[in-house]
Amino acid sequence: MIKILKSKEELNLGFALRTKVFVEEQNVPIELELDEKDHSENTVHIGYFYDDKLIGVARLIDMDKDIIHIGRVAIDKDYRGKGIGRELIIGCETIAKDILKREVIIELSAQIQAEKFYKSLGYNRVNDRIYLDARIEHVDMKKVID
């Protein structure tokens, strides 16, 4: 089940999963992983629950802007390769569309190894630039949802 994380308990579970994936597995510094956008009123945190366990998270930021961003997409290691990420991204798109009630332009900063995954969901590169974020190669991608 995909839902918006609202309670402090749910948000803390989401932050813990992100810390596990990004900080522990990918060695991203904690001060880069958790940031001020996590507590912005224009951020929506999304969770994927399986048997009441949070196994996937993402966040929608800049919900007050013309272009919103999906980021901090993390899936528990034990559940990767099972289509959870695909369902989570589609869920994020649906939630964004439901909240904003208009055409939605979504941009994201994809880790280079996830580019094919996002391409399969209809995202395209914005440019040819590959850049480092937290010492991991990324590319900018975009999708318009009518």
PLM segments and residue spans:
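Conserved GNAT acetyl-CoA-binding A-motif
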Residues: 89, 96-110
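A conserved beta-turn-beta hairpin within the catalytic core of GNAT-like acetyltransferases
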Residues: 62-70, 80, 100-104, 132-137
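Conserved beta-strand in the GNAT
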Residues: 47, 53-62, 66-74
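Conserved catalytic-core motifs of GNAT/GCN5-like acyltransferases
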Residues: 107, 119, 124-140
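A short beta-turn/loop motif at secondary-structure boundaries
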Residues: 35-40, 131-133
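Acidic/histidine-enriched, beta-strand-rich ligand/metal-binding domains
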Residues: 78-80, 102, 109, 113-117
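Conserved acetyl-CoA-binding loop-helix of GNAT-fold acetyltransferases
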Residues: 75, 81-94
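Short amphipathic alpha-helix that is part of the acyltransferase structural core
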Residues: 1-33, 38, 49-53
